[in-house]
Design a protein with these regions (language model features):
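ATP-dependent helicase/translocase motor core
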Residues: 3-306, 315-330
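Conserved, well-structured core segments
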Residues: 309
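Short beta->alpha hinge that forms the Motif I/post-I loop of the SAM-binding pocket
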Residues: 312
Length: 330
């Protein structure tokens, strides 16, 4: 599967607005939910109900929780159907996202270019998965700094672009030029724009990947882009509301999880023999998140009935348990 560039979503060929994306999403909802809809597409009134619920999504963090509902199958419930002779269900729940359908299944992938908003801003590139604007990309010339692109996203947020509307579904922001690229989880508030959580992509040897062609192939192509806003996204439902957020894994964490998968399932050797191994993380590099994601991954695979987490200091026990509970809420 690869990204498809439809003329109807190309703002360099015709005017494309956020409303255009919303109408495209409506078609995707009808496709994904054909059985639930009993072959009768959403009416204007029914889709208005959907949009009312979308406009209640405060920010990207709340959207992340919605997308992770019911074993990572995002849903919107409580939609009442209009009378129709072929409709037997009075109320329905619509599926909007399936994390497990990476590079196949029912997932679709489209690129929208030069998308105008009602605030007069223009999004350079929006990557749509099942019609949802999950990844936003801001492009700059090589003589411009990536900080300028970062501040541009910050300004968009200040003007209301990513709150209580369709664009609140954004989960990852990418700032890029021909010679440099960085990514970060879409902040849940203006105060959460923090350059300390802006990462570069790197390969398995931890060598930074910067050239735009390499970034496309190694980071923004399917399946990796879908995985970044699915498998490699962590929702932290902390006790304190100010600490609640969603996070994207850093590249070395992604490579670590892939290495663990290869070792545990025997995918990294020609004989297909599972074997052990270890992941080397330094202090402050996200060991707890990597451990949680490892345990979660193995627990979903056949042949792994129990995952044991061993800590070498007593004070780490309660701290790790608290973190795992926060990560496991969604």
């Amino acid at each position: 599967f690869r990204w498809k560039a439809l003329d109807s979503l190309d703002g360099t060929k015709q005017k494309v607005t956020v409303d255009t994306l919303i109408e495209h999403w409506r078609g995707e909802l009808n496709r994904l939910n054909a059985d639930v809809l009993e072959g009768v597409p959403l009416t204007d009134g029914e889709f208005d109900q959907v949009l009312m619920k979308v406009n209640q999504i405060d920010n990207s963090y709340e959207a992340a929780k919605l997308l992770a509902m019911e074993q990572s199958t995002g849903k919107i419930d409580g939609i009442y159907r209009d009378p129709h002779p072929n409709v037997t269900r009075e109320q329905i729940t619509l599926t909007i996202f399936k994390k497990a359908h990476v590079g196949g299944g029912e997932s679709s992938y489209h690129i929208a270019r030069e998308v105008e908003s009602k605030y007069g801003n223009r999004f350079d590139l929006v990557l749509l998965i099942n019609g949802l604007p999950l990844i936003n990309i801001e492009q700059k010339r090589s003589d411009k700094s990536l900080e300028e692109a970062f501040r541009q996203f910050e300004r968009y947020y200040r003007e209301g672009e990513f709150v209580n509307n369709f664009m609140a579904f954004s989960q990852m922001m990418v700032i890029t030029s021909e010679v440099a690229t960085r990514y970060f989880a879409t902040p849940k508030s203006l105060n959460d724009f923090n350059e300390s959580f802006v990462f570069h992509w790197s390969d398995r040897q931890n060598k930074p990947v910067n050239h735009w062609e390499d970034i496309i192939e190694q980071f923004l192509m399917i399946p990796r882009a879908h995985q970044m806003v699915g498998d490699y996204l962590v929702i932290e439902e902390a006790k304190n509301e100010e600490n609640r957020r969603h996070m994207l894994l850093r590249p070395y964490q992604v490579h670590a999880l892939q290495a663990i998968e290869g070792a545990a399932l025997g995918l990294d050797n020609k004989d297909g023999i599972p074997h052990g191994g270890y992941v080397w993380h330094t202090t402050g590099s996200g060991k707890t998140i990597t451990s949680f994601k490892t345990a979660l991954f193995l627990s979903t695979k056949v042949g792994f009935d129990k995952v044991v987490f061993l800590v070498d200091r007593k004070e780490l026990d309660s701290r790790t348990s608290e973190s795992f509970k926060a990560y496991a809420a969604y």
